[in-house]
């Protein structure tokens, strides 16, 4: 089965997630067996030491010893988890993938030892959470991506009982984590207390769960294609959604579009509670209001019949940046991008010898735009450009000393007189925000 899996998925380079437990140990020896049979692929192992168990160091030593004995390259990586005990599994998982992401090579695929029983447990946990088709479809047997890591789970159709039988038959040593018997963890509770009763009543329960998951994955794939078509009708940029017609669309379709739009921006599916809140408090709030919903470090805001996904940043209107050398890029604060000199930028006159280029994000002075005869406040000009209010004080304003020159990428003031025989200066603002506002 494993041989066919590797051939069918055309995997050439494998990074094995090797905990030393029975499943990853079984997978390691199966990969070794295939290598000895001259199957064309390379593999190495990674062991993540979570430092949560008194025997963590012994487990690392065991994995290292096994790999050395079989000439398997191995990386031992320690991670530190200091956080809420109620979320320890979730946090450990995230940190584990972050550590792997830093180590995995571009053409490598991560292989894990998840088996048929794990798949059933995952489905039941999704039921407990009230998940939809995405959660209930559980783990994918085929190649997919998590945290930007390509991952395969070749043992998902092999039961834990079959793995144990093979391990005992070949007298192979593995690590038994005593915490696996602690039923305060939901997965252990299901495995030890619930699933045995279900199997006693229905012996093929786990295999039927696996079949249901396969069906759900097929349906999810078709549904995903249809949702993508719907979403693309309203997507302006990944961070901007046109909601002008949402009042005339079925509420359930709107909710699905919203969920998948948020997933594009935060990589995880939002809860139905959050989607409902966005639908009621943002989309259908008063026309003249500026509603927002906060999701972690981000905000969802509405302006001019559009939803915006934007990062929260501190107030920066009092910041002044001096730019003495335009040959070098100037990095703006809070990941607002860079200002560079290039051939594609906004054309500006060179500053005079006694003038210093400085960048600000606010001015109370009225300004005069090129080809305009009336001085206006920036606030008024930004309104004319239909810029969302929260973006207006993120736009770099170029000053020569205290004289306003331009709002970079938008407009230039015509109040600055160019010195004779001076070449123009061309400046560009390189930023994802710039793509949004112009």
From Swiss-Prot:
Q: Which UniProt keywords apply?
A: ATP-binding, Cytoplasm, Ligase, Nucleotide-binding, tRNA processing
Q: List GO molecular-function terms, semicolon-separated.
A: ATP binding; tRNA(Ile)-lysidine synthase activity
- Per the record, the major location class is cytoplasm
| Gene Ontology cellular component list | cytoplasm
Entry EC number(s): 6.3.4.19
For ATP, which residues are the binding ones? Answer: 19-24
- The reply to whether ATP-binding figures as a keyword in the UniProt entry is yes
Q: Which Gene3D superfamilies match?
A: 1.20.59.20, HUPs (3.40.50.620)
Swiss-Prot/TrEMBL catalytic activity: cytidine(34) in tRNA(Ile2) + L-lysine + ATP = lysidine(34) in tRNA(Ile2) + AMP + diphosphate + H(+)
Statement: the UniProt record of this protein carries the keyword Transmembrane = no
Q: Which HAMAP family match?
A: tRNA_Ile_lys_synt (MF_01161)
Report the protein's function. Answer: Ligates lysine onto the cytidine present at position 34 of the AUA codon-specific tRNA(Ile) that contains the anticodon CAU, in an ATP-dependent manner. Cytidine is converted to lysidine, thus changing the amino acid specificity of the tRNA from methionine to isoleucine.
Family designation: Belongs to the tRNA(Ile)-lysidine synthase family.
Q: What is this protein called?
A: tRNA(Ile)-lysidine synthase
Native species = Buchnera aphidicola subsp. Baizongia pistaciae (strain Bp)
């Amino acid at each position: 089965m494993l041989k066919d899996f590797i051939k069918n998925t055309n995997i050439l380079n494998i990074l094995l997630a090797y905990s030393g437990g029975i499943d990853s140990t079984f997978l390691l020896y199966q990969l070794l067996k295939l290598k000895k049979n001259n199957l064309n692929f390379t593999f190495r192992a990674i062991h993540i030491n979570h430092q949560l168990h008194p025997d963590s160091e012994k487990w690392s030593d065991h994995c290292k010893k096994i790999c050395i004995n079989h000439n398997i390259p191995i990386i031992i990586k320690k991670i530190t988890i200091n956080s809420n005990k109620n979320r320890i599994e979730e946090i450990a998982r995230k940190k584990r993938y972050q550590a792997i992401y830093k180590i995995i090579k571009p053409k490598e695929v991560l292989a894990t030892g998840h088996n048929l029983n794990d798949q059933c447990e995952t489905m039941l946990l999704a039921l407990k959470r009230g998940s939809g088709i995405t959660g209930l479809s559980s783990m994918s047997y085929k190649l997919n991506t998590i945290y930007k890591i390509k991952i395969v789970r070749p043992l998902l159709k092999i039961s834990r009982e079959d793995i144990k039988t093979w391990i005992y038959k070949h007298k192979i040593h593995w690590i038994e984590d005593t915490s696996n018997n602690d039923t305060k963890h939901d997965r252990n509770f299901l495995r030890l207390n619930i699933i045995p009763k279900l199997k006693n009543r229905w012996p093929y329960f786990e295999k039927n769960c696996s079949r249901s998951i396969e069906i759900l994955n097929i349906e999810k794939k078709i549904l995903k294609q249809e949702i993508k078509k719907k979403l693309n009708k309203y997507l302006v940029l990944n961070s901007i959604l046109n909601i002008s017609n949402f009042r005339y669309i079925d509420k359930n379709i709107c909710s699905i579009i919203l969920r998948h739009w948020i997933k594009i921006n935060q990589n995880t599916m939002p809860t139905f509670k959050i989607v409902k809140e966005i639908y009621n408090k943002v989309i259908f709030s008063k026309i003249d209001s500026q509603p927002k919903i906060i999701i972690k470090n981000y905000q969802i805001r509405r302006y001019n019949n559009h939803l915006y996904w934007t990062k929260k940043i501190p107030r920066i209107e009092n910041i002044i940046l001096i730019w003495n050398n335009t040959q070098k890029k100037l990095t703006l604060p809070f990941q607002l991008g860079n200002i560079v000199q290039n051939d594609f930028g906004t054309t500006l006159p060179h500053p005079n010898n006694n003038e210093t280029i400085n960048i600000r994000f606010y001015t109370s002075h009225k300004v005069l735009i090129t080809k305009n005869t009336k001085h206006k406040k920036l606030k008024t000009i930004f309104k004319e450009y239909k810029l969302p209010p929260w973006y207006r004080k993120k736009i770099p304003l170029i000053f020569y000393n205290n004289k306003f020159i331009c709002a970079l990428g938008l407009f230039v003031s015509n109040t600055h007189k160019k010195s004779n025989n001076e070449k123009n200066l061309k400046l560009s603002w390189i930023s994802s925000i710039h793509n949004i506002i112009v």
